[in-house]
C-alpha cells in the first residue's frame, strides 16, 4: 500500500497528460556492440521495454477508473501489476541513459566520493559487479545516493522494483541482470556481461545524476 499511496497521484496525472511512451535511445541499436549486440538491443528496447510501457498504460487506465469509482479493492488488486510495470519502465529508462558508446570518466566529485567509500574506484567496480552477478533470479545492481546519510550505496533489487520507491536511494547507475539483457549473446555467462558493461558506462550521465542528487 505504501508504494500505491505514493504513486496513485502520479497515475492520475499521467492519465490526464497522456500515455507513457518508449524513450528513444541516445544511440543507434548497433552502437554498443560488441559488448551489447544490435540484436539484443533491438529486442531489449523495442520489445521488452515496449511491453512494460504498454502494460503500464493499460493498468493506469484501469486504476484511474477504479479510483474514480472509489473501488479501493480493485486499486489494491491492480497495484502489484502497476508497480512491476512502472518499475520496468523507470529502470530501463535510466539504464539506457547510463550507457554510451563514447568513453567517459566520472566527475572529480563522484570519483572522490567513490574512492572515499570503497577505498578505490577498482574496488567499487568489483563490489558492484559481484553484487549484480549474485542476484538470484532476475533483478538489478545499483549505485545509489542516500540523501539522509549523504553517501553512496550499492545494492541489488529483485525483479523490477524501482530503487527510490523501495529503498529511498536516488538511482545513479544501473546494471540490468535480467537474462533478456544478455542471454541471446552471452548465454548464461552473466559475469562476463557484467564485467564488459563497465566499458560502456556513461559516466557523464552518472555524474550528472550524482551532482543533482547532492545539490538538492
From Swiss-Prot:
Binds 1 Mn(2+) ion per subunit. GO terms for molecular function: manganese ion binding; superoxide dismutase activity. InterPro entries: Fe/Mn_Superoxide_Dismutase, Mn/Fe_SOD, Mn/Fe_SOD_BS, Mn/Fe_SOD_C, Mn/Fe_SOD_N, Mn/Fe_SOD_N_sf, SOD_C_sf. Its cofactor is Mn(2+). It catalyses: 2 superoxide + 2 H(+) = H2O2 + O2. It comes from the Eukaryota. Its EC number is 1.15.1.1. Its main location: mitochondrion. Residues 1-18 form a transit peptide. The keyword Iron-sulfur does not apply. The keyword Ribosomal protein does not apply. Keywords: Manganese, Metal-binding, Mitochondrion, Oxidoreductase, Transit peptide. One of its GO terms (cellular component) is mitochondrial matrix. Belongs to the iron/manganese superoxide dismutase family. This is Superoxide dismutase [Mn], mitochondrial. The lineage of its organism: Eukaryota, Metazoa, Ecdysozoa, Arthropoda, Hexapoda.
Amino acid at each position: 500500500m505504501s508504494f500505491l499511496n505514493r504513486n496513485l497521484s502520479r497515475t492520475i496525472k499521467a492519465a490526464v497528460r497522456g500515455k507513457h511512451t518508449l524513450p528513444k535511445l541516445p544511440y543507434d541499436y548497433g552502437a554498443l556492440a560488441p559488448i551489447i549486440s544490435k540484436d539484443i538491443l533491438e529486442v531489449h528496447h523495442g520489445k521488452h521495454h515496449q511491453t512494460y510501457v504498454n502494460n503500464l498504460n493499460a493498468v493506469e487506465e484501469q486504476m484511474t477508473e477504479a479510483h474514480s469509482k472509489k473501488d479501493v479493492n480493485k486499486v489494491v488488486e491492480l497495484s502489484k501489476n502497476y508497480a512491476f510495470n512502472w518499475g520496468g519502465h523507470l529502470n530501463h529508462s535510466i539504464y539506457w541513459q547510463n550507457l554510451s558508446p563514447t568513453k567517459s570518466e566520472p566527475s572529480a566529485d563522484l570519483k572522490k566520493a567513490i574512492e572515499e567509500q570503497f577505498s578505490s574506484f577498482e574496488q567499487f567496480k568489483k563490489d558492484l559487479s559481484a553484487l549484480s552477478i549474485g542476484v538470484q533470479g532476475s533483478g538489478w545492481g545499483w549505485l545509489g545516493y542516500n540523501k539522509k546519510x549523504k553517501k553512496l550505496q550499492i545494492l541489488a533489487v529483485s525483479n523490477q522494483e524501482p530503487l527510490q520507491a523501495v529503498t529511498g536511494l536516488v538511482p545513479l547507475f544501473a546494471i540490468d541482470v535480467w537474462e533478456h539483457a544478455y542471454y541471446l549473446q552471452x548465454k548464461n555467462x552473466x559475469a562476463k556481461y557484467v564485467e564488459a558493461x563497465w566499458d560502456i558506462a556513461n559516466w557523464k550521465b552518472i555524474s550528472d545524476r550524482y551532482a543533482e542528487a547532492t545539490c538538492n
